[in-house]
Amino acid sequence: MAKEKFDRSLPHVNVGTIGHVDHGKTTLTAALTRVCSEVFGSAIVDFDKIDSAPEEKARGITINTAHVEYNSLIRHYAHVDCPGHADYVKNMITGAAQMDGAILVCSAADGPMPQTREHILLSRQVGVPYIVVYLNKADLVDDAELLELVEMEVRDLLSTYDFPGDDTPIIIGSARMALEGKDDNEMGTTSVRKLVETLDSYIPDPVRVIDKPFLMPIEDVFSISGRGTVVTGRIERGIVKVQDPLEIVGLRDTTVTTCTGVEMFRKLLDEGRAGENCGVLLRGTKRDDVERGQVLVKPGSVKPHTKFEAEVYVLSKEEGGRHTPFFKGYRPQFYFRTTDVTGNCELPEGVEMVMPGDNIKMVVTLIKTIAMEDGLRFAIREGGRTVGAGVVAKIIE
């Protein structure tokens, strides 16, 4: 059979498995590729290959992640699976693999465990919008009442962290059976097929980056005699067209301006799009009115803030992080997009110190405003050295 070429016409959705160690995340990941290859014609990936996930670096942090892909009838899925709990924490906080939805794998034999809870909390903090549940190892549970009990526990846990527990789809099955091609009582391949159909129906198509409101972090500012001020950067999302009204947000008071030209590789364009490095010519803006670290945005789409709740991963000594813990009142630099801003860290009640390698919820107060939204990633630095990674969980002011 000829090798199929990647079908760009199918909408692309990013998912991943989350849940407690040994509840069957990797087995389910392998089973998904197997079932989808038989039903929808994508490639099979073996358990061992997923389990020995390669190391990758995201923002200087080493993370082991396995990436697989599979198709349903209507979509192309990119799926991430992490071997260790620490890898999940790092992955979700750095946004190395952002998920449009997560598959929570919970063993029906054991019920929710500490990491089940922690992964749901992390999903909430980093803004994973949808969770679908797969109750695994159901072939080991003879008692229907026990299954119901575990299902109720999982729903309660989801509701605790503001996911719609009562309405979350829960599929009951056995990933091992599906991987072995068995299907007694529809627990094997049928359950995985049902899972894929649920992903199709429950997780909506993600909004494409290009359809979101325009945002470009400013990396550099030039003044071109006779033409005015040009700001350069890589467009993070959306489209900017000549004559669009724009706002410059962060570090100082927000100012209003107009795009009078877009340049890329010294050519003039009518518009700049997400992912492109370009220069935007601004009308009526002086060279000294703008600086690196501000963002150029569609008016009203992003506001400047200084205080927020964050979920943070502190690099271990081995990862080049701090060798010693830090305490309340810690004042490092927070690196947002293109600039560092000093901020003060408030630790949760009862937490005296934070050790390298920990992940922690903290409240940060910056000394200058930054254009920010929930889900924005940042690095924590000391004198230019990265010592942590974080994500804005909730804006306070």
Curated annotation (Swiss-Prot):
Region of interest: G1: 19-26
Chain positions recorded as GTP binding sites: 19-26, 81-85, 136-139
Residue ranges of every copy of the tr-type G domain listed in the record: 10-207
Predominant localisation class: cytoplasm
Region (G2): 60-64
Region feature (G4): 136-139
Residues bound to Mg(2+): T26
One Pfam assignment: GTP_EFTU_D3
Region described as G3: 81-84
Subcellular location: Cytoplasm
Entry's EC annotation: 3.6.5.3
Family the entry assigns: Belongs to the TRAFAC class translation factor GTPase superfamily. Classic translation factor GTPase family. EF-Tu/EF-1A subfamily.
Function comment: GTP hydrolase that promotes the GTP-dependent binding of aminoacyl-tRNA to the A-site of ribosomes during protein biosynthesis.
Protein name as catalogued: Elongation factor Tu
Organism annotation: Pseudomonas fluorescens (strain SBW25)
Gene name for this UniProt entry: tuf
